[in-house]
């Protein structure tokens, strides 16, 4: 289902990010970002999300690719911060695969209502 290289690079990036989280380095952007705390990581994810939207709005495929890569990277940093592995995301996507998006969304709404 997945592109082996894409799966590999995502997993490799995640491993490096976790390494920087667990063994901070002074010369590491990731270590620096993670040491600033979750709020700073969330701020970066928000910034990168906005940049993706702007690149898409401007209909610039090269810029959009660049910004999507930045967003993906910062999502991996957030995942490492929260100790959520790429395999957990893959498992959730596989669970949803083949299910109507409307059906899946309705099941989440019902689940939320059940917990209210």
Regions found by a protein language model. Name each.
Residues 1-68, 72-116:
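Flexible "arm" and connector segments at domain edges
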């Amino acid at each position: 289902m997945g592109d082996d290289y894409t799966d590999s690079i995502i997993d490799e990036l995640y491993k490096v990010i976790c390494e920087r989280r667990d063994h901070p380095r002074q010369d590491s952007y990731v270590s620096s970002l993670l040491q600033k705390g979750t709020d700073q990581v969330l701020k970066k994810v928000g910034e990168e999300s906005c940049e993706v939207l702007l690149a898409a709005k401007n209909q610039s495929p090269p810029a959009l690719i660049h910004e999507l890569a930045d967003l993906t990277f910062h999502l991996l940093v957030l995942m490492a911060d929260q100790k959520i592995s790429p395999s957990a995301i893959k498992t959730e996507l596989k669970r949803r695969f083949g299910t109507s998006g409307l059906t899946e969304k309705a099941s989440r709404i019902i689940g939320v209502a059940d917990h209210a």
